[in-house]
Each structure stands twice: as C-alpha cells, then as structure tokens.
Amino acid sequence: MLRRLHPDQPDTFTFAPANHAWAEAQITKFPEGRQASAVIPLLWRAQEQEGWLTRPALECVAEMLGMAYIRVLEVATFYFMFQLQPVGRIAHFQVCGTTSCLICGAEDLISVCKEKIASEPHDISQNGKFSWEEVECLGACANAPMVQIGKDYYEDLTTEKFSDLIDEFDNGNVPIPGPQNGRYAAEPEGGLTSLKAYTKSATIYNASAQTAVDLNDTVKRIDGTEVPLLTPWLSKIKKSKKMLPKT
C-alpha cells in the first residue's frame, strides 16, 4: 500500500526541550557513525509529541541523525505505526481486525468507532478529540478483541467496555491499559492452573501496564516532562571506558 505525506503541512517542527534532551540521549546508545540507528525512536517521540509525523518533523530527525531526508521518509512511510496525517488530539484508536480479534468481535468494535467517532477511518471526530483505523495483527491474540492507542494496549474488550473507554477519554480521564475484563495478563479466564507461585510476587497490573502507571507514561504525554529521562546505558559506557587499557 502506497503511503504519502498529508498535503497540508505545518511550516516548522521543533522538539519540546525535554523531548529534545530525550532524543539526544537516545543517539548516545549507538557508536559514532551509527546514529541513524536511532531513527525509529526519534520518529516515535516526534509522533508522541504531535500525534502524527509532519514533513518538518522528518526533516528535523534527518538533521539530528545526519541522514538524507529520503531515508527518514522511507522509514516513516514503511511502518504503519507512524501516522502520516492528523489524528484526534486525545486518542487515535487502532482496532485490530485480524483473525483472532475478528472472531471475537472486532467488527463490533469498528461499529462503535463509526457510531461514536467518525463513519470513515482516519476521519477526525466532530469535537476533534478522536480518530480511528483498522489495523493488522497487534500480537495480543490471547486477549482479543483489542485496540491500541499509541503504545498502550486495551484488551479483552466488549462493545460496552469499548464505548465506556471512549467516554472515559472524552471526560478527560486515562483508563489504565491492559485487559479490561479483570484478567491480569493472558491467563485462562478461570485463572492459572499451573505456575501459581508467580502470583505471590505479582504487581498490581501486568508488566507493561504497571510500567505505564509507575512512570505516568500514558497517551497523555505531550512534551516529555511527564516522564523521567532514563539513560542507564550511559553509566555502563563510562564504566567500560574506564576498564580499557591505557595506551
């Protein structure tokens, strides 16, 4: 499927200061001359800041990484996780429509999107808050049907729960990601039948949802100040340099 940039583009893009610091930190993960390896995380952060990727954002990332603009454009147009047109300012719902989710009710979730958001995918709701699209498998087949918002999964949905989810976002709340039917992760609905000792050390939510809660790393991120700048690899780099033999 051919993907192009949206015809209406802003004049400029600038990373917010905290996001710029985060981006510069990501670049240090890679050896000199390999900065292009940071292209996906930088594009993702630009999208988290703006909601979608604009041409000026691609140009900014290309300049930061010393890449030709066309190379960054190739990445952005190849991966469907990158939005190339405006989306709802609160949430863009990606509804998985592949086999497991389809069998378990994805079409019903799409009907909810058409009723409560917009009749066509990628159209923005009248209040400007939401948009939606159907996507291919998101790898949460054991928790079908589900939707993705940014990097958060909302799983084990019914039409009622999904409708309530949209209402929660509309009211300014951010529902906790993960299973929405009371399941911890992807265990059988009746509960674990083996490896039960694991539950003794379990966190309140499963690992991905717990991380989102602990770091306040949710769909509400805008400028990067909402979460701490974590760069554990820098201390390892400094330690390894100290261990190098002197010449």
Question: What is the meaning of each model-derived region?
Answer:
Residues 1-247:
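Signature of N-terminal electron-transfer/Fe-S-associated modules in redox systems
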